[in-house]
Amino acid sequence: MADVRDVMVEGESGLIACSARYGLEAHYIVSKRRVEFQNGARAYLYSADEPNRLRGPQHEKAWCDELSTWRYADDAWANLDMGLRLGDNPQVVGTMTPRITKLVRDLVKRAGEGHDVVLTRGKTSDNKANLPDAFIRSIESRYAGTRLGRQELDGELLEDIEGALWSLSQIDDCRLAALQDAVSLQR
C-alpha cells in the first residue's frame, strides 16, 4: 500500500496534486483506504499484493499503476475485472513501463484483436515538460540505444532477448494448454 499512497495518492502526479491543479479538493482518509473528492466521488485504494481485497467490491473505474510488476497479477486482475460492474461503461486505465508478463501479453493481444482493450504507448520524451532537463540528459546519455533504454525511454514491449536460441513467440507456439489424459505412473 505504500506505493499506492506515495505515488498514486500523495505523489507529485498523484490524485491529490492533480485534483488541486483543477481546483478540486481531495482528501486521503488513511483508515478507510480511500480518497474523497469535494464533488462526492470516492477512490478506493487497493494493492495487487492483496488480491483478495478486490474480491467482492464493485467499481466503475480503476487505475492500475505499474501493472507489469504486480506480484499476484492474475488474481488481482481477475478480482478487479469481476468487480467492474457499476455504471454504463466500466473502464480500467493501466499505466506501466512495459514488461512481458502473462497479463500484459494477454492485454496487448486483446488490443490487437480489436477487443475491449485500447493500447496507448508513450515515451519518456513525451513527458519532458514535467521532468528536469538534467534527468532527461542523464538517462538518455546512459540508456539511449540499449535494451533497457528501449523499454524505459521508448516504451517498447520487448519480447525477445538478443542472442537467445528461441523467441518467446516460438516458445509460446509450443506450449501445452493442459495435459490431456494424464497417466499416473506407479512403481
Model-derived features: where do they sit?
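Conserved SF1/SF2 helicase motif Ia
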Residues: M1-V4, N89
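Inter-Walker segment of RecA-like/P-loop motor cores
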Residues: D3-E60, L157
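Short, conserved catalytic or adaptor-binding loops enriched in Gly and charged residues
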Residues: R34-Q38, V108-H115, C174-Q180
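A generic local structural motif
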Residues: S47-P51, N79-L80, D173-A178
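Short, surface-exposed connector motifs at secondary-structure boundaries
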Residues: Q58-W63, N89-Q91
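Walker B catalytic acidic pair
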Residues: D65-L67
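ASCE P-loop NTPase helicase motor core
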Residues: T69-G145
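ATPase catalytic-site recognition across NTP-hydrolyzing enzymes
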Residues: K128-R187
